[in-house]
């Protein structure tokens, strides 16, 4: 579970970076009532990335870890792309 907690922290940190360091909007929602985890990144009100994990508490640990790693990697890729844009111009 420590690995999953670390991944949650990384995802939240990346969402915070998008929100305060860019003109992108981010949200991370963990809804215990609906048993889901949802991450979204938007630019100018249009979805750029979203991922939803339904039946969160019923997921096997390794599958959940795989999905959280995929989310973190996707957000890191978007962050890297944003940082490279000024260098390309």
Whereabouts are the PLM-identified features?
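Short polybasic amphipathic segments
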Residues: 36-42
């Amino acid at each position: 579970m420590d690995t999953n907690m670390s991944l949650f922290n990384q995802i939240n940190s990346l969402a915070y970076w998008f929100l305060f360091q860019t003109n992108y909007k981010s949200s991370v929602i963990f809804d215990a009532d609906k048993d889901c985890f949802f991450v979204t990144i938007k630019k100018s009100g249009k979805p750029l990335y979203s991922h939803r994990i339904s039946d969160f508490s019923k997921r096997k640990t390794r599958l959940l870890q795989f999905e959280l790693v995929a989310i973190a990697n996707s957000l890191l890729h978007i962050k890297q792309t944003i940082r490279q844009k000024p260098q390309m111009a």
